From Swiss-Prot:
GO terms for cellular component: plasma membrane. InterPro entries: Protohaem_IX_farnesylTrfase, UbiA_prenyltransferase, UbiA_prenylTrfase_CS, UbiA_sf. The keyword Transmembrane applies. The chain crosses the membrane at residues 32-52, 53-73, 98-118, 120-140, 153-173, 180-200, 226-246, 251-271, 280-300. Signal peptide: none annotated. Keywords: Cell inner membrane, Cell membrane, Heme biosynthesis, Membrane, Transferase, Transmembrane, Transmembrane helix. The keyword Cell membrane applies. This is Protoheme IX farnesyltransferase. PROSITE patterns: UBIA. GO terms for biological process: heme O biosynthetic process. One of its GO terms (molecular function) is protoheme IX farnesyltransferase activity. It is a multi-pass membrane protein. The gene is ctaB. CDD domains: PT_UbiA_Cox10 (cd13957).
Length: 316
């Protein structure tokens, strides 16, 4: 395995042009940020108390800003390996559009503003958890786990699972079982989702010296672990129905989606070589995104329908 030892001097020297707003938006990882907003919205809607729309909206903005800050700080620290990996070479820092110091300052200021804002508009317990989430993603995952263990995405995946809890805590002032259920779904979903991509991009991770599971333990072990985690994910995806805050319709949907996820995982497990192995892995990667989106979208839809005046049903 190769390890990164070069400095970021060349990257900084290349960032001689004035960065555009689009470059700073790219630093915030907008795709990841949009998923964070969506899962956080779910956390807001499942809260048992009446949510002031202004507080709810401001809390979502603060959480989104915290996610964006995490992305910017991640790109600042990872700019050396981003310059090596094909899938990340066009990011703002390795592409020379944003200097590392600018990305660091942007991320730090945005992180501070997000935490302070959430504290003032919601409560300081939620703000503290948001601060911990940013710290966990940037320091625990990015600076430590990512480059030191093949279990990086297993432990580090907790950072992506915290937003629904932060949002729930912001509007309800406490954390209860429904919020923890959303955390569990995202936490268990993350490893098979990312390992499916890692099977295809193993060469990229190898060049950058990142000890992903396929590079350290081999693709066969990775396929086995993808299947095991998916078998665990399927029933966990149904917990919103089991514990009573989602409807039987959600239960049926999550059961069906879980079955399709298992089918994809079995195909990944059986396809061991060649282009076919890459194709089934990418299909699972793509479907895993749809899986998570549909689960959370179903919960959001049920909650919104329950709030409409034409609905006589109470929230599940």
């Amino acid at each position: 395995m190769s390890f990164v030892s070069d400095s970021n001097t060349a990257i900084d020297q290349a960032a001689i042009s004035i960065a555009s707003p689009a470059d700073y938006l790219a630093l915030m990882k907008p795709r990841v940020m949009s998923l964070v907003i969506f899962t956080a919205l779910t956390g807001v809607l499942i809260a048992p108390t009446h949510v002031n729309p202004i507080i709810g909206f401001a809390s979502l903005l603060a959480i989104a800003a915290g996610a964006g800050a995490s992305g910017a700080l991640n790109m600042w620290y990872d700019s050396d390996i981003d310059a090596i990996m094909r899938r990340t070479q066009k990011r703002p820092i390795p592409a020379g559009r944003v200097a590392r110091e600018s990305a660091l300052a942007f991320g730090m200021v945005l992180a501070l503003l997000s935490v302070i804002t959430l504290g003032f508009v919601a409560n300081w317990a939620a703000a503290a958890l948001l601060a911990f989430t940013i710290f966990f993603y940037v320091v625990i995952y990015t600076m430590w786990l990512k480059r030191s263990t093949p279990q990086n995405i297993v432990i580090g995946g907790a950072a992506g699972a915290f937003p629904p809890i932060v949002a729930y805590l912001a509007v309800a002032g406490q954390v209860s079982l429904p919020a923890l259920a959303l955390f569990a779904i995202i936490f268990v979903w993350t490893p098979p989702h990312f390992w499916a991509l890692a099977l295809v991009k193993a060469g990229d991770f190898e060049r950058a010296g990142i000890p992903m599971l396929p590079n350290v333990k081999g693709p066969d072990r990775t396929r086995r672990d993808i299947l095991l985690y998916t078998l665990l994910l399927a029933p966990i995806g149904m917990t919103p129905y089991f514990i009573g805050f989602a409807s039987p319709a959600y239960g049926l949907l999550s059961f069906g989606l879980g079955g399709v996820m298992i089918l994809h995982a079995v195909r990944v497990y059986l396809a061991r070589e060649g282009d076919q192995a890459n194709r089934v892995a990418m299909r699972m990667f793509g479907f895993s995104i749809l899986y998570l989106f549909l689960l959370f979208a179903a919960i959001v839809a049920e909650r919104i329908l329950a709030l409409l005046p034409i609905s006589s049903a109470t929230p599940w």
